Amino acid sequence: QFTNVSCTTSKECWSVCEKLYNTSRGKCMNKKCRCYS
């Protein structure tokens, strides 16, 4: 799943993904957070 959350490191996305998609797996791609379920 793609998000509109900007990021610089994948670590920033973990809590975002947990909130949005209830998954703790996320990566920073092209300066945006991307979540995996």
Swiss-Prot record:
Belongs to the short scorpion toxin superfamily. Potassium channel inhibitor family. Alpha-KTx 01 subfamily. Has the structural arrangement of an alpha-helix connected to a beta-sheet by disulfide bonds (CSalpha/beta). GO terms for biological process: defense response to bacterium; defense response to fungus; killing of cells of another organism. It comes from the Eukaryota. Its main location: secreted. Disulfide bonds join 7-28, 13-33, 17-35. The lineage of its organism: Eukaryota, Metazoa, Ecdysozoa, Arthropoda, Chelicerata. Potent selective inhibitor of high conductance (maxi-K), different medium and small conductance calcium-activated potassium channels (KCa1.1/KCNMA1 and others), as well as a voltage-dependent potassium channel (Kv1.3/KCNA3>Kv1.2/KCNA2>Kv1.6/KCNA3>>Shaker/Sh). It blocks channel activity by a simple bimolecular inhibition process. PROSITE patterns: SCORP_SHORT_TOXIN. Signal peptide: none annotated. The record marks 36 as: Aromatic residue of the functional dyad. GO terms for cellular component: extracellular region. This is Potassium channel toxin alpha-KTx 1.13. The record marks 27 as: Basic residue of the functional dyad. It is found in: Secreted. Residues 26-33 are annotated as: Interaction with Ca(2+)-activated K(+) channels. SUPFAM superfamilies: Scorpion toxin-like (SSF57095). It comes from Leiurus hebraeus. Pfam families: Toxin_2. Keywords: Antibiotic, Antimicrobial, Calcium-activated potassium channel impairing toxin, Disulfide bond, Fungicide, Ion channel impairing toxin, Neurotoxin, Potassium channel impairing toxin, Pyrrolidone carboxylic acid, Secreted, Toxin, Voltage-gated potassium channel impairing toxin. The keyword Transit peptide does not apply. InterPro entries: Scorpion_toxin-like_sf, Scorpion_toxinS_K_inh. The keyword Magnesium does not apply. Expressed by the venom gland. The modification Pyrrolidone carboxylic acid is found at residue 1. GO terms for molecular function: ion channel inhibitor activity; potassium channel regulator activity; toxin activity.
